[in-house]
Amino acid sequence: MSILNGPRLNFWGGIRTDVSLPNNSPTIPMGTGGSQTLNLFDLPNSQVAAEAASYSDDQLNELINAPNGDYYTAGGWNHYGQHVVDMQNVLISSQGTPGAISTTGDLVGQPVYLLGSKDPVTNQPPVSGPMMVDLDPTSGITTQIYIGGLQIGGTSNPQLVIQADVVASSFDVAKRLLVGETDAPGSSPLSGTFQVTFPLSAVVSWNQNSAMLKSIIQAPGATGIVVRFVMFEMCPGMTTPQLDADYAAGQYTPNPSIGRVVGTLAPAFAGEPLICPVGRQLVNGKTGGTGYAEVVALKGQNLLSLDMLNLIPKATFRAVRTDITSPIGPNIDYGPVSISAGGTTLVTLPSSNPYLLDYYLYGGILDQALNATQLTQVNGSPLSLSAPNTVAGTKLAVSEMTYRLYCDQRNLYMDEYPEGVTLDLQVRYLGGPVPAAGSITLAASSPGSYEDSEYWDLLDYPATFAIAKGQTSVQIPISCKAGTTAQAGYTNLEYSLEDGSSFSNFRIYSITDFGIPAGSVPTWDQVYPAVLRFHYLAFPAMSRFIPLNQQDAIWNARAAIVARTADAYRGTTLYMPVVRSMSPSQRALLKSYLTSTPWQP
């Protein structure tokens, strides 16, 4: 089962992501009207760029925070974020089984929270929330959210508590609104889909009197609990004038991105993807918005369950910038929506249908009954959605990608795989095995701003990989190229077959001695520029806990820093730094300094 074919809890509300922005670009504008550019950061190596090294920390902070005309500051719209993700008044809005979803029930109205990690060493409960991390900070397709659990219900009467360290990665980043917010990043019209699967063993407590929770947790054959949520209509809370005034007054207030979230919780089963939606893939040809479909056999009835949350766009951004908890409002009304298989219309839904009009109450999921003839058509033909009206120069034209490729290995840090990694790539045709032998094509490129090949051409992989008729998966070996240990960068590896494609991202850290002789005890003057200066400038919120530019403060906190940069914390929201920007060589150098032990690169 999954969010499409199992019992569901649907929820919606607001969400905030408090990320820090200066590391999103290696350069910043400077001079009158941004007429010049300064190479500020060497992001693959997490260091201040050579061109900026002679500037003082205060000078660089002033340049980062300088107004940048009508678009925030030279360093972007948030310099002081802690990377925390938190839900805002997210409530369960409907529950039930496919074909029988209701806006009333024992859990409707209960709040939903994502949690941070409990301490893996001391077992202390979470003290912070989930953390948003970009594998490549210059990219829009490498976002991750490190999560430590989930809770339904308030602290005084929790209905469900889950504790497990999982990572959600962004999928299906595409246009969700025809028009975004004007005073905002270019991502404001976009949406991103995130999914995690918690094992059943991670359930700490639950209300066993809840029939709905019982149907999920005790679903026959269930192995876990899956949560899929979509973030959209996101923009910084403050406008450009507000942020510039705040910085000018010396307040340096965090300016998180705020927006909408719609999601679904359901039982997970063996063989289903853990971090991406299950089912056949449909794509809106105009916006790139992606949906999923699956045939459900339930209580003697066949249903076509459609995740349509991203398939029909919304016309405009919300009217009130900071209002992220009021009703989201309808998508574009293209007229009656026809769902078809091949050339045959299965059903035409009026635009007043509640699953179209109030889609966010139902997780964006629609269940449509099928008769025997329709079931045969759906199983053997591509699906599509269409509607008659043209709105703002756009029409609704959604088609199924007959081939779908997907993988639970989305964002990988290659230092964790010194011998290489094998991608377990799932391949489907109309939801089933491939009908004929074929050849999967693989191609590497840059996922972000670092387009020179020295920063992304770092992997060994087969250019093509055969798949036989009847197969549903292949295992593809990936490793770092020989002779690249001194290089650092980011690689996007796309895999495609016929009309289907997807990708995985990789971060490769350099192995270096920083020019420090082996056997010597590192000094502050060596460690600060090699390890800490970049983090002090790019992530000043860290210094609100430990001032990263103060030798005494770092030394006094040495035990905590050594602990939190250790591998025991790596998969948690408590890892330092939370953005995973410190290479193994940097961590080793920092530890050598903090423990006064000879440097062994």
What label would you give each PLM region?
Residues M1-P601:
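Aromatic- and Gly/Pro-enriched helix-to-coil junctions and flexible linker segments
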